[in-house]
Amino acid sequence: MLPLIANSCRITVLKLRKKEIMTTVSAIEFDAKSGNYFCKVGSKTIKSYSKPYVERRVKAMVGDVEVAMAAAVEKSNRYDINTRFGFVEKLVNMVATGVQPSAVITGEGGLGKTYTVTKTLEANGYKDISDLADFQVGSVINSRRCFTMIKGFSTAKGLYRTLFENNKSIVVFDDCDAVLKDPVALNLLKGALDSYGKRIISWNADMKDDDLPRSFEFTGRVIFISNMDQDRIDQAIRSRSMMIDLSMTLDQKIDRMEFIAKSDEFLPEYDATIKADALALIRKIKSECKEISLRTLIAVSKVRASNKDWKDLATYMLTA
């Protein structure tokens, strides 16, 4: 059990996932005016005329954080990060084959979530129609074997239009976290993500002079790729979707980057030795780096390939 802290301080209990599980414990003080002892634990204040009671409550609350830490550590150790990315492929396969209408994939950006989803869909024979300019005029497109990527999308009405225009297809929402926070958009998604019966999506607001229907049956499928923590996503979405959490520790990020760097598709213009040297430097100074992602590895690999005395420049870029 963590000891009761005699003065105000921050205790970092866990730095395992994207966010830290931490608590701030203040000193126990006495308020002469009210006759109560009080102590702040995080955002909560414990108050009582009995100092031993306050001490017991503080120790219990800090203990709860320790329990959460232990559970998170156990879960993380059970499945390594590359295994979890393999789970993403399996889940996307289920969406592609119509077994599952929706999936939510969460975790920090820049480590291959979008790449894994798109490559898995393409491996299942789906075409990316995100940019219709890539197709010749008059081309026949089988919408049931297509997917479209939506980025930076913000309004509920925009969501309604997107689902209507891409009905029968797979819609991939990439980093559209605003949609997951909008109450109206969430209600629309509930209809789109249900896994039983007809999925009817309705828009009750005035649509005068608009080409959208008031309601329609959605027969497509949805994949969300989000940088949000899984527990911040609305319960209604979580209960209707299958979810994979790709939150990573610093070491897991580098393990994932090492796995990707060994692929022939990653920076094929550079020798494997160059990528290995770049990765070794990142691993050495990982705790000092401002950011660690595939973009980091790409940047350091370029510096390694272009400069004989490359380490100082690369270190400066990563840490300054």
Put a short name on every predicted segment.
Residues 4-38, 47, 79, 89, ...:
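Short N-terminal "domain-start" leader segments
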Residues 69-96:
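N-terminal pre-Walker A segment at the start of P-loop NTPase domains
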Residues 98-117:
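Walker A/P-loop nucleotide-binding motif
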Residues 127-170:
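Short glycine-rich substrate-engagement loop in P-loop NTPases that contacts/grips substrate
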Residues 172-174, 200-204, 217-227:
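Structural recognition of the conserved hydrophobic beta-strand(s) that form the central parallel beta-sheet
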Residues 181-218:
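Conserved catalytic/switch belt of AAA+ P-loop NTPases
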Residues 232-251:
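A short helix-turn-beta junction within AAA+ P-loop NTPase domains corresponding to the substrate/partner-engaging
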Residues 264-319:
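Conserved AAA+ ATPase small/helical "lid" subdomain
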